[in-house]
UniProtKB/Swiss-Prot annotation:
Belongs to the universal ribosomal protein uL23 family. GO terms for molecular function: rRNA binding; structural constituent of ribosome. Gene3D superfamilies: 3.30.70.330. Keywords: Ribonucleoprotein, Ribosomal protein, RNA-binding, rRNA-binding. The gene is rplW. InterPro entries: Nucleotide-bd_a/b_plait_sf, Ribosomal_uL23-like, Ribosomal_uL23/eL15/eS24_sf. One of the early assembly proteins it binds 23S rRNA. One of the proteins that surrounds the polypeptide exit tunnel on the outside of the ribosome. Forms the main docking site for trigger factor binding to the ribosome. Part of the 50S ribosomal subunit. Contacts protein L29, and trigger factor when it is bound to the ribosome. This is Large ribosomal subunit protein uL23. GO terms for biological process: translation. One of its GO terms (cellular component) is ribonucleoprotein complex. Pfam families: Ribosomal_L23 (PF00276).
């Protein structure tokens, strides 16, 4: 028995909130060059499907796949007190061949 495809509709307001910020670091840049991937900090409750739809809507590119990871916040000392940084959810977005994302603000 095959399942019928589930139609998913997202509001543009929700999709605009899903992507919190791009992660631009040395590691993220090397991953982007090797595997044609882009890293984003996303909401804790964001799904892979929402992330894919948000990237395609905001940047007008085609997404091949999305992998996510949940990173626990580090325990750090602030003065004499111990605290914890916030937990983080990262999305590794693989772009289809020939697609490119540019964060510098210049037209590609």
């Amino acid at each position: 028995m095959s399942r019928a495809p589930i139609s998913r509709t997202f509001t543009e307001g929700r999709l605009a909130q899903v992507l919190v910020a791009p992660i631009i670091s040395e590691k993220a840049t090397s991953i982007g060059e090797k595997h044609n991937q882009v890293l984003f900090k996303v909401l804790q409750d964001a799904t892979k499907i929402e992330i894919k739809a948000a990237v395609e809507l905001m940047f007008k590119v085609e997404v091949e796949s999305v992998q996510v990871l949940n990173q626990k916040g580090k325990t750090k000392r602030f003065g004499g007190r111990t605290g914890r940084r916030d937990h983080l959810r990262k999305a590794y977005v693989s772009l289809k061949a020939g697609q490119e994302l540019n964060f510098s603000g210049e037209a590609a």
